[in-house]
Design a protein with these regions (language model features):
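Bacterial N-terminal signal peptides
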Residues: 2-12
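Short, cysteine-centered beta-strand-loop-beta hairpins and adjacent loop/turn segments enriched
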Residues: 32-38, 89-93, 113-117
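Central antiparallel beta-sheet cores of small beta-barrel/beta-sandwich binding domains
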Residues: 39-95
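Sec/Tat signal peptide C-region and signal peptidase I cleavage site
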Residues: 13-17
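A short, structured loop/turn motif at beta-sheet edges
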Residues: 18-21, 73-79, 97-104, 126-133
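Tryptophan-anchored aromatic micro-motifs
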Residues: 21-35
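Short beta-strand segments that buttress and anchor functional surface loops
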Residues: 27-29, 81-88, 107-113
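Edge beta-strand at a domain terminus
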Residues: 113-133
């Protein structure tokens, strides 16, 4: 289950940063799935560079937890983005969407397949200020 949650972080976060402002961001993620006793909240912080903020496919995820997941369809709007993705090694597929501004964001992702898994994530994020060492 822990690996699946890490996979969701890798999958959900790359598509969130189309025009987000660089700096220190705080994210709260709630994961739900059938059979889970209650939602599994998680939080993390990320220092996003100006380069990462410009390109949603190069932001987010954890390089120490590689994955073969890839975005297959990506649609961008002025303050929203949606995507479809697939992860060949796990047999999982998913869809997601996000709305954002320079200092905040919200997203929803649904991933299923593999061992009949149906995971849903809701993410909220806010910019805290400049990156801190």
């Amino acid at each position: 289950m822990r690996a699946l949650l890490a996979l969701l972080l890798v999958v959900a976060t790359p598509a969130l940063a189309q025009e987000m402002e660089p700096g220190e961001w705080e994210f709260q993620i709630v994961v739900t799935a059938p059979g889970m006793p209650k939602p599994q909240p998680m939080g993390y912080r990320n220092c996003m560079t100006a380069e990462q903020a410009k390109d949603p496919l190069h932001w987010g995820g954890n390089p120490s937890q590689p994955t073969d997941c890839r975005i297959t369809t990506l649609k961008k709007g002025p303050d929203a983005i949606s995507w479809k993705m697939e992860c060949p090694s796990t047999g999982m597929n998913g869809v997601g969407s996000a709305r954002f501004g320079r200092g905040s964001m919200q997203s929803e992702t649904q991933v299923g397949g593999g061992n009949s898994v149906d995971l849903r994530t809701k993410t909220t994020g806010r910019r805290l200020g400049p990156c801190t060492p």
